Amino acid sequence: MVKENQNIDILNQDDLNGHSTYQLIDCFINTIDLVGVFELNVNLIIENCIINNLQIHSCWFVNGLSVKNTIVKNSVDYQMGGHNIKPIIIEGSIFKSFFSFFDCQFENVIELKNNIFEKGTNLIGNKGEGFENSFAAGFLIDNNIGKIDVSEVGIL
């Protein structure tokens, strides 16, 4: 499924069901609500979009997630996430508020390249804490602006 050049009020699990790949390209998206969607089996690709409200607490992107050249306006709370069989790629995007990764277990690689985190992220922060993120296949972090090793738990 490809949605291109659209204004989308809300995208949730019901919209993604039955698709192996779901692409959002050049869209204005008010809300992506995937809170508590364990084992999301779609490869979600978001490119050149503006997202007002990205809600992904407890979402497992089993078949991968790609966010490229996208602006995310809200604070993102990604707890108990990861569990990805395919890579999670975040590239060339701008996050206007804090992006909190909390107790995520990444089974495949996560890539952060050429992003701007205006208020930072704790992806590789919280060292030694019981809720520190884990990376079974490692991570690739390159050329990001903003602190990526914040040692904070909540949304700043």
Feature roles, as predicted:
Residues 2-156:
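Tandem repeat scaffolds
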